[in-house]
Structure formats: structure tokens, C-alpha cells
Amino acid sequence: MDQAEYFHSWCRQDEMMLNLLEKCPTQQIQRLPLPIRRLEKKQEIQKMLEARREDYHKAMEGVAREWEKLQEKEAEIRVGLEKYKKSIVKNDKKQERAFRDAAKARSMCIQYDLQLKALQEQCEELDKKRAKTKAQVQKYEKCHRYLEKVVKASEKFQSIPELMSQFHALVSYLPQEEQEEQKSQESRSQRIHCMEEKSDSIVQFSNEIHRLYIRLEKAKKKRREWELRWNQMLKTATRKNLLLGTIKAAVRDIFQTVISQGLGSNSVGEDDIVEQLEIIRKDIEDLTDIWEKLSLNEELMEPIRAPLLPTDKTLGHPPSQ
């Protein structure tokens, strides 16, 4: 039996008392005097009321405990939701920062690749210049030997100074060639050093990209775990809300039963469960006080009245009170 049926049966206790009195054996009523029968019936009714009252108090204590548990669960769920929201915001920020770092690393890699290509082009140009310079030197040496032969064979160059002036003219060009060669060597060494540095930087950035990718995967995994926890908390909250709705419906049915019998005020809102329980408790206490007063008055009146012998009209039926 659920709580609603229990309180409906409790509110119909007058009918149950009458049925109980009607089921009493006729021979036992004939043997006992009327005051004793009334006293026994009153004691039975008081026992029934005490049992009903104890059951009601136990039911109310259970409802109060469930209500406290539900409030504690609701507070825990709210705290968990706040923590979950904060963790989501924190993970989103971490993810955005990781994306920014990865984009920055990619842009730097692209920039370094462009610089490396430019240096390679410069090195190629310098190699071409060096080859051209070497070719010119070889060409001038051949020309010098050829000119000596020409001086010997030709009539145009008759003296050695003319030949030396021509030689010095050729030698004056050699320092420039050496400087260019030295610059070419320096640029080559710089290129090699720069390529080594850039390769190390590329390796470092590749490792950084890999590490950021691992962090991104961990963040995605943690986000999925929190989504699963969120779904579980939603299911728990839904189940608790259904249980709370069942309890509220039972209390509302009891309150409507009390109101329909004219034992309480109808000014309480439908959602004010605590106030409805308080009105039910007060009505039960009022009915109990009335019953005790009537019982006390009846006990005071019994010694004054003379004992009545059972008649045909009273046999099998309880006296009206």
C-alpha cells in the first residue's frame, strides 16, 4: 500500500470503526454490561488511533529524510555542474592557446623555409660568380702567355716595360678576385652555419608541434569524459526529480482529502508541500484532542447514568455517540 491509499484509509476510520463494532459477537455483548462494552470499544478505538498515529509519524519521518537527501543530492549536483563548467572553459582556453601556438609554429616554419630558399639562391649565385671569376682568371693567364708570344713575334710590343705594364695591369686585378673568393668562402660558411641553425630550429618546432598535438588529443579525451559525467548527472537528476514529484503528488492527494472533509484551509498553494504537511499534522492533532475530550466527557458521565440492560434494539448494534 502506498502513502496515498494509507491516508485515504486513515481518513475513513469512522466507517471502519462502525464495521468493527458491528462484527462483535452478539453473545459477548449480551454477557457484558453496556458501560464495560463501551469502555472496551473505546480502548480498541484508542489502540487503533495510536497505531495509526505511529504509522503516520513514521511515514512523515521517512518523507522528511527523503526530502533532506534530495536537497543534499541537488546541492552536490549543482557543485558538480559549476566545476564542470569551469573545467570546460579552462579546456577551451587551453585548446585555443594550443591552436594559436601551432599556427604560430607553422607560420615560423614557412618563414624559415622561405629564408632557406633565399639563402640557397644566393649561394647558387655566388657559385656562378666564382665559376665565372675562375674562368676569367684562366682566360687572362692564357692571354698573358699568348701576349708574350705576341710580343716576341709582333712588332707592336718592342720593350719589356710595355710587357710589365701589361703584366701589372693584369696583377692589379688579382686582389679583387681574391677578395671575391674570400667573400664567397665566408658566404658559404655562413650559409652552412645558417642551414644548421635552421635545421635545429625546424626539429625543435616539429617536436613542439607533436607535443601540442598530444596535448590536444588529451584535452579532447578529457572533454569526452566530462560529457559522459554530465549525461550521468542529468540522468540522476531526472530520476530524483521523478521521485520528488511522486512524493509531492502523494502529499497533495492527502491534503486534498483533508480539505474535502473540511478539516483544513484551502489557502495554501499547490506547490507548498511543507505547509500542506503542517496543516495535515495540525488537523490530526485537533482531531485527536477532540476525541480525547469526548472520551473524557464520556468517562465523567458514565458513573451518573444507570447501567442499561441490553434490549432487542441494542443487540448487535453499538450505541450512538
UniProtKB/Swiss-Prot annotation:
Stated family: Belongs to the CFAP73 family.
Keywords (A to Z) from UniProt: Coiled coil
The protein's name: Coiled-coil domain-containing protein 42-like 1
Superkingdom assignment: Eukaryota
Gene Ontology CC: one annotated term: cytoskeleton
Disulfide bonds: none
Coiled coil: 36-144, 202-229
Keyword Coiled coil: yes
Statement: the UniProt record of this protein carries the keyword Coiled coil: yes
PANTHER family documented for this protein: COILED-COIL DOMAIN-CONTAINING PROTEIN 42 LIKE-2-LIKE-RELATED, COILED-COIL DOMAIN-CONTAINING PROTEIN 42-LIKE 1
